[in-house]
Structure formats: structure tokens, C-alpha cells
């Protein structure tokens, strides 16, 4: 998958490049940064010649005669199922996506560096999963984790367990190498398929990713070295 960045702030652009390059290297994803620029017309020209699905990180306010949302609208004409993510400091401009009818994957706000990194990675994960779903391999099972204004798609095989959050109506998905907080309930998750089992009031585990169980201490250990607890009556059921 080719990734395009259009950001007119050089420092912000370089920061995004670093985040994405590190992610690709560490996770060994089949992705590459095809272009990082402040020129929207360079991105549009690349989109016109795309044979595959692209992933576009677009600053909304650009120092040119075209803004990021208009750019996204033009990209849609050439890459109708591409992943478009808007990066901005101005939340009040998000309404323009409805004006231009751009189906954006996410809106990422620049103000919080930690959140910026997390959301970029979430978008890359979701873009990768979408690409797999659109490829010939339709056997990959995924779940949509709703986070409010956006969703993250993750594969069943990447899930270690789900945990109740301290925040109302929210859960935490423990994946192979990260955690995602989302809206949901454990009862529904335990019914996804036979691999998911509610071992405790606060946990639903993925049986396929269990490494070992300490029946005496009622602790479930997973392949990624995390653990959770099981109730007495559910230890033997697993």
C-alpha cells in the first residue's frame, strides 16, 4: 500500500513521516511512503495514476489555493475506495467533508503528539485490514471497534482478550502489540464465535491466543505475555 502525506508544516510533516516509517519497519507491513509534500497537486497527480488503493494523510489548511478537503474530494474521483485521513488543528472545519462528500476514515488533531501517533497507527492498521478484505483472501475475520467518530478494524487473530474499562460503556481490546479503547459490551463479544469466551465478569478471552492457564491462581496467560484473571467456575471450562 502506498502512503501519501500532504502537510505544509515541515516539522509536522517530518514527524508524520517518522511515525509511519517506524511503524512500517517494526510491524513489517507491506506499505511505503510514496510521497510526503506540501504540494497538493503532486498528491493529486499521483492519485490519478494509482492502480492500487492508497492511504492519504491530508492537512486541511494548506498554504495553497486548494484546501485538504477539496484535495480529498478530487482524490476520490481517481481512488474511490482509498483511505483518506484528515490532519488538522481546526475541528470546526470538519463539517466541510460533508459539503464535499468526502468519506473520511478519520480526523486527527495535531495538538496532542501522543494522540497523533496513536491515531495514525490505528488508521494504518485499519487501512491494511481493509486492503486484505478487498483482496482475494476473504477468509480473514475482522471486528469493527467503534471509538466514537471513527472505527478501527482488527483481525480476530490479533486479539488476546477484551477487558472492561473504568469508563462507562467502554472496553479495552488487548491486541498482540497494543491496546484500543472502544465502545461495546462483553456479552456481545463473547458471542462472536467459539474462540471467544467470557472467563470473568470483566474479561472475554480469545482461546486461540492462550499460552497457559494457572488454575490455582486463576490466571490466564497469553502469547503476547499479557495476562488476565478467570473466575473459579470458569477456569475448567476453558
From Swiss-Prot:
The modification 4-aspartylphosphate is found at residue 59. One of its GO terms (cellular component) is cytoplasm. InterPro entries: CheY-like_superfamily, LytR-like, LytTR_DNA-bd_dom, Sig_transdc_resp-reg_receiver. Keywords: Activator, Cytoplasm, DNA-binding, Phosphoprotein, Transcription, Transcription regulation, Two-component regulatory system. Residues 143-238 form the HTH LytTR-type domain. Required for high-level post-exponential phase expression of a series of secreted proteins. This is Accessory gene regulator A. It comes from Staphylococcus aureus (strain Mu50 / ATCC 700699).
Amino acid at each position: 500500500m502506498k502512503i501519501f502525506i500532504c502537510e505544509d508544516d515541515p516539522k509536522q510533516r517530518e514527524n508524520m513521516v517518522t511515525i509511519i516509517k517506524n511503524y512500517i519497519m517494526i510491524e513489517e507491513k507491506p506499505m511505503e511512503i510514496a510521497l510526503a509534500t506540501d504540494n497538493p497537486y503532486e498528491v493529486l497527480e499521483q492519485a490519478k495514476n494509482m492502480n492500487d488503493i492508497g492511504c492519504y494523510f491530508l492537512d486541511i489548511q494548506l498554504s495553497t489555493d486548494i484546501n485538504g478537503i477539496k484535495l480529498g474530494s478530487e482524490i476520490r474521483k481517481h481512488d474511490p475506495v482509498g483511505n483518506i485521513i484528515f490532519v488538522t488543528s481546526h475541528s470546526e472545519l470538519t463539517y466541510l467533508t460533508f459539503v464535499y462528500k468526502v468519506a473520511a476514515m478519520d480526523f486527527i488533531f495535531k495538538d496532542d503528539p501522543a494522540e497523533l501517533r496513536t491515531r495514525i497507527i490505528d488508521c494504518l492498521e485499519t487501512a491494511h485490514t481493509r486492503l486484505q478484505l478487498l483482496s482475494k483472501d476473504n477468509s480473514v475475520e475482522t471486528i469493527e471497534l467503534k471509538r466514537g467518530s471513527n472505527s478501527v478494524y482488527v483481525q480476530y487473530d490479533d486479539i488476546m482478550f477484551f477487558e472492561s474499562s473504568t469508563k462507562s460503556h467502554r472496553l479495552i481490546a488487548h491486541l498482540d502489540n497494543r491496546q484500543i479503547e472502544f465502545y461495546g459490551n462483553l456479552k456481545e463479544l463473547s458471542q462472536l464465535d467459539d474462540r471467544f469466551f467470557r472467563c470473568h465478569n470483566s474479561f472475554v478471552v480469545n482461546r486461540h491466543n492462550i499460552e497457559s492457564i494457572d488454575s490455582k491462581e486463576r490466571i490466564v496467560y497469553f502469547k503476547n505475555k499479557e495476562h488476565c484473571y478467570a473466575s473459579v467456575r470458569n477456569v475448567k471450562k476453558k
